[in-house]
Amino acid sequence: MAKHRYLPMTEQDEKEMLDVIGVKSIDDLFQDIPEKIRFKRDYDLKPAKSEPALLRELSKLASKNANTSEYASFLGAGVYSHYIPTVVDHVISRSEFYTAYTPYQPEISQGELQAIFEFQTMIAELTGMDLANSSMYDGGTALAEAAMLASGHTKRKKILISGAVHPESSNVLKTYATGQHIEVEVIPELDGKTDIEALKKALSDDIAGFVAQYPNFYGQVEPLAELEKLVHENNSLLLVSSNPLSLGLLTPPGEFGADIVVGDSQVFGIPESFGGPHCGFFAVTNKLMRKVPGRLVGETVDENGKRGYVLTLQAREQHIRRDKATSNICSNQALNALASSVAMATLGKTGLVEMAKQNLDKSHYAKQKFREKGFEVLFSDGFFNEFVVKLSKPIKEVNKSLLDEGIIGGYDLGFYEEKYKHHMLVAVTEMRTKEEIDAFVASLEGAK
């Protein structure tokens, strides 16, 4: 008989397995773990509950969370509250799509491969690049992989990154760089954008690439044309991390001459989910095609001349080349990429532009209301859907008060930068109404 209800292994099965590997007991398998830190007690689990009782308890726990369908959220900083068309969940819940993995058998996976191909196509069009891969873990890892590509392509071991790039993405890059013995230098931010003079001084023959964010962490739109000229005159690569929704209005980075464009497609069809899982994208020019990390789906024809889709250029990948691969990324975010594909296809080009325009208009309306009420709003008016407001009280304290009023406040910039203590990064998406924006501004009057 099996010792555990849901584990089919019997005591005899266990004994035979231990005999094969020459071990007397299960405990011997953990002999490398010091005796004093091994867990030997029984788990203090509550008695089993019926399904209705369990659902009640889980619902009670879930109700402690602030749900953005019930609260007016002005929180962004990389993860945003956007409308998700109902059709998205319907499509991704279909059994033939319900996996995070890229299909290796094209004969039985044409639907999923075509959906991934469409994702690549739409991302390439949005970013103005020649091609995009099937997805990455998230925007941060996509940025780090871009830096690794730049270093490998240029044979240089130093990356410059703007201080106006999201701090979490910057930290992911630094983690990657440590293992690859790549030096990362942060170019300071000045008035919410990259300090151009500091960048000029930092550029040298050992610089593989420069990383900018567009729009950046503070919501500002970086001068990509000027950055591109400086970086390419140094024979370095220009890497741009971008919010793909903003590209419904802004000039795509590819048109400025960016070599690699990365970001997160969470803004299309993917819920906030406490910060993940989301879906990174990675787009490049043709000259870097064979150095792209992750999966690439290509269009071809079968022996009957019919259109088909396959994984292509696989010699780059770790399941083929192992330690010589362009990257060791393995499973990707195929299911979330599908969600973004469905959302983008549902919006269409006109709908995407309208969604981006609502973000722009509503955030600028909010900024104007703050100024009318006497708040100090930092930096220029050249932003997409985020801006910085200075308050007189700690942001943590302010946000706690806002939550009691049914409002999720903006991001506390002082968490990363002491000079931005008492500064709130406010995000305004198409989900917010005029009444909610007015109420938000009014609620902050006491913290002006």
Curated annotation (Swiss-Prot):
Gene Ontology MF term list: glycine dehydrogenase (decarboxylating) activity
EC number(s) stated in the UniProt entry for this protein: 1.4.4.2
SUPFAM superfamilies found in the cross-reference section: PLP-dependent transferases
Swiss-Prot/TrEMBL keywords: Oxidoreductase
Catalytic activity: N(6)-[(R)-lipoyl]-L-lysyl-[glycine-cleavage complex H protein] + glycine + H(+) = N(6)-[(R)-S(8)-aminomethyldihydrolipoyl]-L-lysyl-[glycine-cleavage complex H protein] + CO2
GO biological process per UniProt: glycine decarboxylation via glycine cleavage system; nucleoside metabolic process
Free-text function comment from the UniProt entry: The glycine cleavage system catalyzes the degradation of glycine. The P protein binds the alpha-amino group of glycine through its pyridoxal phosphate cofactor; CO(2) is released and the remaining methylamine moiety is then transferred to the lipoamide cofactor of the H protein.
Subunit structure: The glycine cleavage system is composed of four proteins: P, T, L and H. In this organism, the P 'protein' is a heterodimer of two subunits.
Family membership: Belongs to the GcvP family. N-terminal subunit subfamily.
Name used for this protein in its record: Probable glycine dehydrogenase (decarboxylating) subunit 1
Organism expressing this protein natively: Listeria monocytogenes serovar 1/2a (strain ATCC BAA-679 / EGD-e)
